[in-house]
Amino acid sequence: MITTQEISQIRQQVRAWHAKGETVAFVPTMGNLHLGHITLIKEAVKRADHVVASIFVNPMQFGQNEDLDAYPRTLAADQQALSDAGAELLFTPTPEIIYPKGMEQQSFVEVPNISEQLCGASRPGHFRGVATVVCKLFNIVQPDIALFGRKDFQQLLVIETMVADLSMPIEIIGVDTIREASGLAMSSRNGYLSQDQKDRAATLKRTMDTMSAAIQQGESIQDVIQAGHSQLSEAGFRPDYLEVRSTSDLSPASSEDSSLVILAAAYMGDTRLIDNLCFTR
């Protein structure tokens, strides 16, 4: 696997592959990789002739009260894991390469409506940072397909909407959430949890399972959400939000909506965890 910080080297290699009629898949990450990321790479290997990954801890998507410097950097281990999974090219730019004029002077991409609720309400500017860096990475790599985990359902919808609205010739593929045996969604943030906190954090998935079953049995969504809040609080969570929305646009679920998603964000100690569960009724 080739690792480079050079935009020109990425473009040269991808152009060479495309000139042969070969397809390119792209998996952007922030590093500190776990099995969920590796699953994305392995799925990409199945779907394209070549796989490009990136590792960039994007300062634009971190809020003022979020410690960018504390995010784990594990480049050597990440390189080995990506290579073993089948990635051929790894882009590891610095903030100065991605934002040469600084973030304040950087042109940006903002997806309205979807970006402003749920995680967007709790983390103002977060999805502007996500959309901007993903747009820039897409322009650098020029992939045919790009893969993202469904664990961050809102992020996936933001990216799908951006690609559609801006007519980008890229197929976006969502890959199912990878979970630990307890049901806890795999996340780089799980490393911040003690074993006791990890055990209690598994309640997040169980709560969503209970909620989806209750809604499918005809219970009121508001009553189900209220019960879910109680279940999370009893496990030691501090819920940020717990909502039931339409999968198409994240609008509040109406009686006509059949394709629904439960979206949750909650703090276990100082660690903010997110998860979601899609279901039909």
Swiss-Prot record:
It catalyses: (R)-pantoate + beta-alanine + ATP = (R)-pantothenate + AMP + diphosphate + H(+). The keyword Protein biosynthesis does not apply. ATP binds at residues 30-37, 149-152, 178, 186-189. Beta-alanine binds at Q61. InterPro entries: Cyt_trans-like, Pantoate_ligase, Pantoate_ligase_C, Rossmann-like_a/b/a_fold. One of its GO terms (molecular function) is ATP binding. GO terms for cellular component: cytosol. Its EC number is 6.3.2.1. SUPFAM superfamilies: Nucleotidylyl transferase. GO terms for biological process: pantothenate biosynthetic process. It is found in: Cytoplasm. Transmembrane segments: none annotated. The active site is at H37. Pathway: Cofactor biosynthesis; (R)-pantothenate biosynthesis; (R)-pantothenate from (R)-pantoate and beta-alanine: step 1/1. CDD domains: PanC. Keywords: ATP-binding, Cytoplasm, Ligase, Nucleotide-binding, Pantothenate biosynthesis. (R)-pantoate binds at Q61, Q155. It comes from the Bacteria. HAMAP family: PanC (MF_00158). Homodimer. Catalyzes the condensation of pantoate with beta-alanine in an ATP-dependent reaction via a pantoyl-adenylate intermediate. Belongs to the pantothenate synthetase family. NCBIfam families: cyt_tran_rel, panC. The reaction proceeds by a bi uni uni bi ping pong mechanism. This is Pantothenate synthetase. It comes from Shewanella sediminis (strain HAW-EB3). The gene is panC.
